[in-house]
């Protein structure tokens, strides 16, 4: 048997982190088993669906790198197939027409609540029975599935263990509306059957749907897939994760500067573990993942831990991979990195100081763009008269360097200035940093100067000396 899993979101909004984790688990299980992963868009809610939401889901999946083998399939393109199966159940008396109006059903429900009974559809209720018997062919009706009245539905959930639900707890659900459109629970079953889905990985909010769907599988003579229901994700306050906890959309995390590898690593650990290991390559995730190692308890989303992971991936990933995802942020800042050092070299130097790609993009402008003025605080503190002589000597030695390397800048410029003027490193290091970067924070100034380049460094040191001269003249 070829394992086949699916991710089946509804296009009523963005791809949120809970859905992304479900997709990741489903994708990983298929990969682990040498199987296939299907993407299906469950768009039967015609009033709430939007193309914008479809695009957001596809964009999120592609950004996370969760490639699908089949799809995306759209349920709205399969209505003929669903109706064919509804008619099959009608012919076999496994479904029936119901003519009870919404008003009548509300009235019956109110009676049940008044009698302290569980509100539910009851085909044998005198009022409902009378409505169905009095109806004439051609009148608007829904089609209901004839749920078994005896026995139980039992299934072995791969995460939660054995689950048993009595058929007496389930009523006859609607499988086709009065407008002829099929309903969610029915479409899902037909889709999973037609697409050969063997394992259904989804959120625990679907547990109540599962016994109903199993009864429909069996009524159709379809194989019942194996189910795995993931626990919910909570915010750090213990409440269900929502917009009030901050970002919940996958693409919001892209916008905030997270790498997809970091988010995937974080999401896989929100419920699944392999010993004490925290960091997993994609290959390790695929090789080690199993559904029975997923916790049935809810997990709390911790942004600090995600940020720590993101910093790890920025520092330790192939700089070309980081550069690929950094480009979007550079575009947002309109920073052209073609006029300067290789972006991969800048990432290697600056990346370890950054928790997000937003921070990284904000910190590297001076490698590529000249600045008209220095940061006020840094200039006030470090570009003073006392820095004039060290910077003048540094300028002369920089201009004299024939090989512009970190080692030569360190020894032939910075160390040489300290030795000749008999000053400490701080007397030249900080003024030089402000001169060449425009601010007071950067990685090692000799390495920064190598990447900025000799011509730019010389011009910027001259600019700093002009700033000092003007400052002294106005003192």
UniProtKB/Swiss-Prot annotation:
GO biological processes: glutamyl-tRNA aminoacylation
Enzyme class, first EC level, given as a word: ligase
InterPro entries found in the cross-reference section: aa-tRNA-synth_I_cd-bd, aa-tRNA-synth_I_codon-bd_sub2, aa-tRNA-synth_I_CS, aa_tRNA-synth_I_cd-bd_sf, Glu-tRNA-ligase_bac/mito, Glu/Gln-tRNA-synth, Glu/Gln-tRNA-synth_Ib_cat-dom, GluQ/Sye
Origin: domain of life: Bacteria
Reactions catalysed according to its record: tRNA(Glu) + L-glutamate + ATP = L-glutamyl-tRNA(Glu) + AMP + diphosphate
Keyword Disulfide bond: no
Motif stretch ('HIGH' region): 9-19
Binding positions for ATP per the UniProt entry: 243
A GO term for molecular function: zinc ion binding
NCBIfam families referenced in this protein's UniProt entry, alphabetically: gltX_bact
Family: Belongs to the class-I aminoacyl-tRNA synthetase family. Glutamate--tRNA ligase type 1 subfamily.
HAMAP family: Glu_tRNA_synth_type1
Protein name: Glutamate--tRNA ligase
Gene label: gltX
